[in-house]
Every structure is written in C-alpha cells, then in structure tokens.
C-alpha cells in the first residue's frame, strides 16, 4: 500500500490542527469530558468480549445477560450523564464538543436499556452473544500452560452462561414474549451447532493450536477440555435445543415484529432513533424508503434497456439466474472475485482520499455453522490476535449465490468502506481512545453504503452488469426501510414483506427468508442505518459543495467525515458545519 504524499500529509495536519488541541484538557469542562471518556472506555473494557479480543486483553469471563447487570450499567451511565450535564459547551474546543455529544448519546442508550430488557432474543444468530463467545474460544491463544488453564476455566463457565440464556428466555415467555415460530427454524439449528462431543464441539481444541506446549501438557489439556465439554458444556446446550424445539416452540407466535409484544412499539421507535442516530419516526423512514425504492427501480429499468433486454424485471431476474458467469464454482472463487474487484479500485483511491489505513485486509469464508443464519457475511476489524481486517463471506449454497453484486458488496465492506472507516479512526491517535473503540451503526453502515455508491464515481461500475449489481444492492438496502418498519411498526405480516422483497430483489428465496427474519425477529431497526446513514452523508456532501463552491475538495470532505471517527449523524452535521467554516477561512 503506497504512502500518501507529503503535501497530503500537510493537508491532513491542517485539518487535524484544531481538534488536536482537545488532547490536553484546558478547562474544568474539558477535564470532565476527558474523564468521562476514560471512565466509559474502562467500563467497556471490563465486559465487551469484542473489545477485549481486539485489544488483546485476557478473556476471563463470559457475558452477563441479566437484568441486574443492565441495571448496574445504567446506574454507571446515569452518574456520568449527571456530571456531563454540568459541562459548559462554550468552554470546549471542537473535538471536545464531539466527545461530549457522543458520550451523551451512548451513555444515554446504556441508561435507557433496562427499560427494554427482555425484548431482544439471546439465541437468534445476529443478536445472540454466542457468536462472540464462540469467537473468543476459537481465537483464544494457548502458548503456554497458564493460558491452557485459563481456557479450561473459561470453558467451565459455559454451563452457567447457557443457564442464564435459558433463564432470560423463560422470563421473556412469562411476559408473553417468545421468539416467532419462523425464527425458531433458524435459532434452533444455530444453538444445535454449538453442541457436540469432545471431537465435534466448537469448543474443542485441535492439536495444531498447541504447538508451543510440551506434548504431555498438550495431551493433558485436551483431555481436560474433552471432559468439561462432555460433562458440563454439551448437556445444557442439548437441553436448551430440545426445550426450544419442543415445549417453547409449542407456544411460539406465528406473527413477527416487535409491535406484537408488551412495550414493543416503544422499543422499536427507540431502536429507530438509536440506529439511525437521527430524530426520526418509523413512519418517516417508511415513506423515505417507498420514494427511494421507486427511484432505484427506474434506474434499474434504464440499465436493462441499455443492455437491450426488452422483457420484464422478473424475466431479467430469471435470465441472470441462468448466467453461469455470475455463479461461483467453489468458495475459493468467491474470495478471488471479491479481491479482484479490490485490485481494480486500489489505484483510484488517492484521487478521493488523503489517507489510507495501515492495516492490511483480505477475505475469508465464514465459519460453516454461522452460514445458515447469515445472508452474506460481515467485516471483522483487526484484533491483537488477528492483525488483518477480513470480510467473512458466506461460501454455502453456491448454486444460489450470484456474484452480480460482488463489486458493490466488497467496496462496502473493505475499500473504501468499512476497512477504511474503522481503521483510519483506530489508527488516528489524536482521537480520544474511547472514540476509537466505539461506533454508531448509521455512521459505520452509512459509510459502507456511501462508499459502495462512491465506487461508481471512481469508475468501478462501467460494466452494466456491475452497475446493475450495484443498483440491486442499493435496492436491497433501501427496501429495508419499507419492510423493517412495515413488520415492526405497521403490523405487516411477514408474508407481505417477503412478497415485496421477491418482487424487487435479486436475492434468492432462501436469502429473502433469512433477511426478513433478521429484520423482524433478530435485530429490528439495525438495517435501517445503512441507507439512512448513507443518505445523510450524501446530503452533507452536497451541503458542503454548495457552501464552498469551487473550493470544495472531495478528499478533504472525506477526511472531515472519516478523520474524527464514528459520529452520530446529528453530530456529524454539526462537525461538517464546522469544517465548512474552517474551509472558508483557508
């Protein structure tokens, strides 16, 4: 990866000059904001498995999913919000003001969380803490006998953890809150994939991970792990699977969506604000989605006409499903195609960005047990154990896995998408540490979607099939605004959402089934952040372009968006206003 020029470095220094002043607290209000940021980061380090893995901190306990823990966290947040309420905004510089905004929003979410406890299901593939728990075990470094003992000690916590998850599900059920029956068809196999004997359990340790242990110690360790799995870990997992698939399922609802549960409508409205980081209501988001879907549909029709296709949209979809060029012959080919698109965009980056992240990147296949519950995959930032940022792709069901939108997808995930956005912030040591380790969904996913669209301005969609793939991905992301709000706030049956998705999307029926459950039963509201965030970033770009006229430089705008880390959309607009004022002074 090439280094950026000295001139570009000087530009970055100018952009960062004022925010850097925030590194040294200047006033009592400055000190309060700095202390709150440090306390919040310490709070996150204590319990976040993701953060502990990323920072290379010891993993010595599994997550606490109880209401008591949420209430304790809320008390911590309330104390700091009280102190932050005494801060005088006029005493803060630009970067301190950003920190204050972020702390108030994120601590506010922690404070409010107990009010909605019991409305998230701990065994659905996206929301479940099992995903991070599995990764903690699978990436647990075992270089010596002390680490081996710590692994066994952590494994011994699994029965209590599984029991706590079951207790949460039982308490939910007592309130009339159960996982919908359709979602159980995914959740039960997901939990079942965690069970297994000493040879098949995902918590077993292959001998290759023990290369630095003395042979006798490795043998003893594997025997200990096998005994714990078969005696303590596997039985409660199998019991949970049997219960979910039997007694629990018998009373599970047919309907989907948060709106059916006590407190569900209020929780969903809160989630919409939380994930979009804007003061918008579900009905507003729904209408934005309807309007944008119509506009994208018109653009897709133009591309079909450009290709000389005279048939209908469903006929073109059927035509594409028969084009062998669009389907991989192996999981490895998926990775090769994705990285091929990355190699095409790399030479164009410097015309649009002042900096590149230092962290390397690549693609890998998802863990097979996670593939049934995930339509595509996810980006995993570098950690101490794995210093490369990887996009984990779904390598299953190859006959149904079209690569039509592979270019648009990987530009969203890696370059110039998540890998740029996450690592440019993490590598920028002028950003307060707590802000390098926290994100807002609308900013993170909004940037990913914006980056995918930006790739078109960088010349990546000259092939009409790549362009159609980009538009199909945009349709996929935008239709979420309609169906997520429809199922959770407007009382839509899942069948209505699925029918609309089948009419407008290129995805297979299997993918549509998975996605519709993700929106309605697993992580409602989260999918709204992608398009809402992207639309807001684009609006702010046009605001800056209009205000600056010929002085507008897209590289400097991108530096302003990315240079201070993840920001709520309302905070980002205030920061872009500050950026515009600074640019006018140049």
What are these model-derived regions, one by one?
Residues 9-19:
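Hydrophobic membrane-insertion alpha-helices, especially the h-region
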Residues 1-11:
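Bacterial N-terminal signal peptides that target proteins for export
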Residues 17-586:
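N-terminal maturation segment of proteins
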């Amino acid at each position: 990866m090439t280094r950026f020029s000295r001139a570009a470095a000087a530009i970055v220094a100018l952009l960062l000059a004022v925010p850097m002043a925030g590194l040294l607290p200047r006033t009592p209000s400055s000190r309060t904001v700095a202390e709150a940021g440090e306390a919040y980061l310490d709070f996150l380090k204590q319990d976040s498995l993701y953060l502990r893995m990323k920072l290379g901190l010891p993993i010595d306990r599994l997550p606490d999913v109880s209401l008591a823990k949420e209430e304790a966290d809320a008390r911590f947040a309330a104390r700091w919000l009280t102190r932050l309420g005494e801060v005088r905004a006029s005493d803060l510089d630009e970067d301190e003001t950003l920190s204050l905004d972020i702390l108030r929003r994120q601590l506010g979410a922690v404070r409010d969380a107990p009010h909605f406890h019991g409305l998230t299901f701990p065994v659905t593939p996206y929301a479940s803490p099992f995903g991070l728990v599995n990764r903690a075990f699978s990436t647990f470094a075992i270089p010596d006998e002390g680490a081996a003992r710590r692994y066994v000690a952590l494994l011994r916590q699994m029965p209590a953890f599984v029991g706590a998850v079951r207790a949460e599900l039982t308490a939910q059920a007592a309130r009339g809150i159960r996982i919908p029956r359709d979602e159980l068809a995914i959740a039960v196999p997901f939990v079942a994939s965690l069970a297994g004997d000493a040879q098949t359990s995902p918590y077993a340790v292959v001998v290759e991970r023990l290369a630095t242990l003395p042979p006798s110690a490795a043998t003893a360790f594997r025997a200990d792990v096998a005994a714990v799995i078969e005696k303590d870990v596997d039985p409660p997992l199998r019991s949970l699977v049997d219960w979910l698939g039997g007694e629990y399922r018998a009373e599970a609802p047919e309907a989907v969506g948060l709106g059916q549960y006590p407190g569900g409508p209020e929780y969903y409205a809160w989630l919409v604000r939380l994930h979009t980081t804007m003061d918008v209501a579900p009905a507003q988001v729904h209408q934005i989605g309807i309007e944008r879907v119509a506009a994208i549909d018109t653009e897709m029709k133009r591309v079909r006409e450009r290709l000389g296709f005279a048939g209908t949209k469903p006929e073109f979809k059927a035509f594409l499903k028969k084009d062998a060029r669009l389907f991989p012959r192996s999981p490895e080919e998926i990775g090769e195609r994705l990285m091929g698109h990355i190699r095409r965009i790399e030479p164009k980056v410097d015309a649009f960005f002042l900096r590149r992240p230092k962290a390397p990147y690549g693609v890998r296949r998802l863990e097979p047990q996670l593939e049934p519950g995930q339509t595509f995959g996810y980006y995993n930032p570098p950690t101490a154990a794995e210093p490369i940022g990887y996009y984990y792709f779904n390598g299953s069901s190859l006959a149904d896995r079209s690569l039509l939108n592979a270019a648009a997808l990987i530009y969203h995930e890696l370059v110039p998408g998540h890998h740029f956005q996450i690592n440019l912030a993490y590598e920028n040591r002028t950003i307060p540490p707590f802000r390098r380790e926290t994100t807002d969904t609308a900013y993170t996913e909004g940037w990913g979607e914006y980056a995918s669209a930006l790739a078109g301005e960088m010349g990546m969609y000259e092939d009409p099939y790549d362009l159609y793939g980009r538009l199909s991905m945009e349709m996929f992301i935008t239709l979420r605004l309609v169906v997520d709000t429809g199922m959770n706030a407007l009382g839509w049956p899942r069948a209505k959402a699925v029918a609309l998705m089948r009419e407008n999307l290129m995805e297979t029926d299997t993918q549509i089934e998975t996605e519709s459950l993700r929106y309605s039963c697993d992580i409602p509201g989260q999918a709204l952040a992608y398009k809402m965030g992207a639309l807001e970033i684009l609006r702010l770009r046009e605001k800056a372009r209009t205000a600056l006229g010929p002085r507008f430089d897209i590289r400097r705008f991108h530096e302003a968006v990315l240079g201070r880390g993840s920001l709520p959309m309302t905070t980002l607009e205030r920061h872009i206003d500050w950026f515009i004022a600074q640019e006018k002074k140049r």
